[in-house]
Amino acid sequence: MNNWQEELFLKIIKREEPATILYEDDKVIAFLDKYAHTKGHFLVVPKNYSRNLFSISDEDLSYLIVKAREFALQEIKKLGATGFKLLINNEPDAEQSIFHTHVHIIPYYKK
């Protein structure tokens, strides 16, 4: 991994890297995933840096999950999705590639 990957989300938060931002408040930011698995796949990222679930504070984790659910329910309704997956990868063996805690919200649609 290089510094670009490590700092990508911080750059998005600071508007130094382009992203389609869907939601932002003082604690989290949500934006479309550049490598989406499905239409509308987005990420919710805490602004306070932590590597993953092993290091995030309980307070930041609670806020992140509540906001991820709240925003997921809102977005899947807009998209016409019939369900969604909430995913958090932790460490390389679990396919974490950007080492800043984040939640994937992946909408699913009727087949």
From Swiss-Prot:
Start and end residues of each HIT domain: 8-111
Span(s) of short sequence motif Histidine triad motif: 100-104
Swiss-Prot/TrEMBL GO biological process terms: nucleotide metabolic process
One Pfam family from the record: HIT
InterPro entries xrefs: Histidine_triad_CS, Histidine_triad_HIT, HIT-like, HIT-like_sf, M_plasma_HinT
UniProt-recorded Gene Ontology molecular function terms: catalytic activity
NCBIfam families with a match to the protein in the record: M_plasma_HinT
Name the record gives this protein: Uncharacterized 13.1 kDa HIT-like protein in P37 5'region
Species this protein is from: Mesomycoplasma hyorhinis
Lineage: Bacteria, Bacillati, Mycoplasmatota, Mycoplasmoidales, Metamycoplasmataceae
